[in-house]
Amino acid sequence: MKTFKYIISFILIIAIDLKANSYNSFGQTGLINLPSAEVHQEQSIYVTVTRGSFLKLGTITVTPFNWLEASYFYYRPDDLLWGGAKGLYLDKGFNVKLSYKPDSLLLPRIALGLDDFAGTGQFTREYIVTTYDFNNLKLTTGLGWGKFVGNSSISNPFALFSDRFKTRQDSGFGLGGEPNFKTIFHGRATPLIGMEIKVPLADDLTFKVENNPFDYFD
């Protein structure tokens, strides 16, 4: 199973423009679970709390600049045995996203992101995505590595430059605290695509759809 059975999210936002962008279940600017290339306005901070059928996740995300989004999260899986019981394990991780918007109106915003890059490996993944903003419609496409790769994947395009990108070292379930640069953007990749549609005459209502290859039970 690759999607939440149910998600209850509470979002507290401190920002200049509350309607600028929306957030995914991991507390990132994005779609449902996928990230987009967007970031929130400068000098903003927001908190998200997600309750799924098999984990609890709380994230604090800051946008100090219009090209940088960083988040710190805690999560508690419900199905992991720890201390002789389930639901007691508590872990943390870090996410970072670098975003760039070319001056041309014809070119999309592009972002490079590292999720859980210094954690224990439960959510370790990388992505490169672009987001086109067509007023009432935002289209996000890109590639994901690591935990993004599910049952369907493609060859790593970076393998054209070096064979070492073809395989990804299994980071396992580590202690965290140190980034493993030997795995970043390594191994097979998977396409990411999703869109967000704003309903006309209802500024606060949007529809989101995405492919979500991430395997939460891997």
Task: Give the location of each predicted region.
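Sec-dependent N-terminal signal peptides
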Residues: 4-15
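Detector for outer-membrane/organellar transmembrane beta-barrel domains
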Residues: 125-217
